[in-house]
């Protein structure tokens, strides 16, 4: 059984084709801007322009045609409204033209679900990206959000700070390299509130200290990462303690950061739980995770009538009943 998935919640358009155990194609194109940030209209235009060539590329890579696809899945939300609507329109058009069932997928859930292709059973997930920062796990038939950012996503915080330092966009990899040269920890605000996190105070103070000219930029980069990542690891560990689950996964674009991986791995080893990070192309926003989650949903008897394929910009993770 094969599923085609279309991802387009933000600045990346991704199209993936998967079977139950294998990724046959996973292609994407990311809108980049000189100043950074994403304008929803520009993202929508980017997705509309590249939808057809990317679909062709995915089918060619998988060595199949649309006739071979069993179900079409698309990212229903959360995300940027105009971008989501382009994706949903394309998915509906394909479903109608080729007479295929269609499934809307929650983007955040898909990030965790794709780890199950690699034998992960029931993890606590730390999902870290530009716009999202969540600790989630399956409890009572739904993905419960145990902790999340109260203001900005960790990826956005990193990008804004990197931009302030003149590193350009995306800033994550460049900030990480700079942080590796840092030697002295500089005190920065650490904000964990219950199980939730806040990064705005950390970002504001890091920028203030940088502008003061009194601190080495390498030390500031190092301290920024250490402070933010320690908070992420703390709330993830609390969720593990609460749920008593034996697996923890790291997903989302910021999962590329080696220091965050290292800190989570140490915590997991201390607790005696399995730690897993998918290959990076399945960590970042991608169509394969949408296809895989959609396939699992479809196999459990879920498909959407067209009138239920409306996009949800603020699609909460715990809205979805997990029956697959």
From Swiss-Prot:
EC supergroup of this enzyme: transferase
Coiled-coil region(s): none
Taxonomic classification: Archaea, Methanobacteriati, Methanobacteriota, Thermococci, Thermococcales
Keyword Acyltransferase: yes
GO annotation, biological process: tRNA threonylcarbamoyladenosine modification
Residues binding Fe cation: 107, 111, 127, 285
Cofactor(s) needed by this chain: Fe(2+)
Family the entry assigns: Belongs to the KAE1 / TsaD family.
Compartments (UniProt record): Cytoplasm
Residues bound to substrate: 127-131, 159, 172, 176, 257
Keywords (A to Z) from UniProt: Acyltransferase, Cytoplasm, Iron, Metal-binding, Transferase, tRNA processing
Protein's name in the database: tRNA N6-adenosine threonylcarbamoyltransferase
Gene Ontology molecular function, alphabetical: iron ion binding; N(6)-L-threonylcarbamoyladenine synthase activity
Gene name of the encoded protein: kae1
UniProt cofactor note: Binds 1 Fe(2+) ion per subunit.
Main location: cytoplasm
